[in-house]
A protein has these predicted regions:
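Glycine-rich phosphate-binding loops of nucleotide-dependent enzymes
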Residues: 2-260
Length: 260
């Protein structure tokens, strides 16, 4: 059974259907991509999964239970964490205190959770922001702020981690390291669900990709299957041709790389 199940979800804003009978899953241990053109409904679906948006129809299940009517904090207590496109850190607090605050809140929910200071020290090191620990969150580079958002989400020890454009603002080497970290987070037993426009990152780290267009899931498959899907090519038009070329170059380099 999938950890997350989105089943025939519909969201309408007035006369506009933002999400149209969307159905997909995310498995524990996998990095799952949710991609599509701008306005396809990706962030709206994240809002439905986390309880910020009520669907007009459909069901969201977590670990087999219907959570469609749950509040955001009830879902967080179940182990659902999220980052946002817009940075949401407490700007006047240090990087350290931002993560510590999240860890302390989790300790109140779950008394057997680790010591908040130890958790914070581990997370700032793990995501690569330890050198910025004492800086105010509103003074760090955008890429660092993105990693801070990830550390705060991880502080509640989530079983399902939703990341909305997490590589935005990261440099090339930072993005590569970030992708490796996502694989580790999934291998630890989490389900990682990612909305991302960096197709090189998506194709490299995702086990499964769902493609949205006009609020509908038009394709689901492995990166190789998605690259070859004509519906996806049509949805992306010329942009997707660049994605295919880039992904094929990465694949070719991996094949040609010397083996130790």
């Amino acid at each position: 059974m999938a950890l997350l199940e989105v089943d025939n979800v519909v969201v309408r804003f007035g006369g506009v259907t933002a999400v149209d009978r969307a159905t997909f899953t995310a498995e524990a241990g996998d990095v799952t991509g949710l991609i599509g053109p701008n306005g396809a409904g990706k962030t709206t679906l994240f809002n439905v999964i986390t309880g910020l948006q009520s669907p007009g129809a459909g069901v969201v299940r977590f670990d087999g239970s219907d959570i469609t009517g749950y509040t955001t904090h009830q879902r967080a207590r179940l182990g659902i964490a999220r980052t946002f496109q817009r940075l949401e850190a407490f700007g006047s607090l240090s990087v350290w205190d931002n993560v510590l605050t999240a860890a302390e809140i989790h300790r109140r929910w779950q008394r057997d959770a680790g010591d908040p200071r130890h958790v914070t020290a581990d997370l700032v090191e793990r995501v690569g922001i330890a050198g910025f620990s004492q800086q105010r969150a509103d003074s760090v580079p955008t890429g660092t702020a993105r990693l801070l958002e990830l550390a705060r989400a991880l502080a509640i020890e989530p079983r399902l981690l939703l990341l909305d454009e997490p590589s935005s603002g990261l440099g090339e080497s930072e993005t590569e390291t970030f992708g490796d970290l996502l694989r580790v987070l999934a291998l630890d037993g989490r389900a990682v669900l990612m909305v991302e426009h960096d197709m090189d990152l998506v194709m490299r780290v995702c086990d499964v990709i769902h493609v949205l267009d006009f609020g509908q899931v038009i394709a689901t498959g492995t990166p190789a299957e998605i690259r070859a899907n004509p519906k996806v090519m049509q949805a992306y038009l010329g942009t997707y041709a660049d994605v295919v070329t880039s992904a094929e170059q990465v694949e070719s380099e991996e094949v040609e790389a010397p083996r130790g």
